[in-house]
Amino acid sequence: MCDLNKTGQGQVECFMWHEGQGRRGSNEIGSCLLKYLEYKASAQENVEVVFYSDNCAGQQKNKFILAGYFYALSKYNIKSITHKYLIRGHTQNEGDNVHSVIEKHVKRALKSGPIYTPDQYVSLVQTAKKTGLPYKVQEMSYADFVDLKKLSEQTSFNFKKDSSGEVVKLANAAIIRIEKENLDKFLYKTSYSEPEYRVVEIKQRTTRTNQTFDNVKLEPAYRDILPISKKKYDGLMFLLRMNTIKKCYSPFYNSLKVSNDVD
């Protein structure tokens, strides 16, 4: 996350985890967004948040991320959330610049020797920026990730058509906006040149088991650390035996959980 203000780039927050702690899907991305939103709401009242991101529909342009936004607006002191998806191949955001700075710093470090553990990457990210505010790192564990798919089910969060009767295709959205005062709907555009927002009403089925965003409790996405494949684990153990990975780093690798599934 990269804060932008009138003077340019502000504080950068980097959320990091390895594959034994989480995957790279909507639950993980959404959990990071919720942590960020909770922090922003605690630091400033009635904040209006605008996110800029790439167009990765699988991770951040779907109804599970939207459900997370509705939850945040219901729970936190946030006035509105707007998410703008940048046009593929035509835009570059501040996040791209941050990634470039980190990548160059890592490449320089690799000239001095190997990087053996995720902790070393954390240190490199924290020291990558040489001027201004250093990058902050939030290290995520499996216990930090919430199940946004479950949240969507618990609240019967659903929608099909906009107010004009057109089927809503989030994959085509360029801008999505949700307002605290109107949590029964969200607004979206399919292009930046579109003059008016399209309105989408949220359809929630009423049953005895339904919960609202006000009273729902977030469920954990994982109950334990995630296993890595046996093939990958065996490869790492081989590198340890050959001393390609130094023995002093063995506690981290020995702590990894291995899958019983056959590759």
Would you name each region that the model predicts?
Residues M1-D263:
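Extended mixed-charge, aromatic/glycine-enriched low-complexity segments
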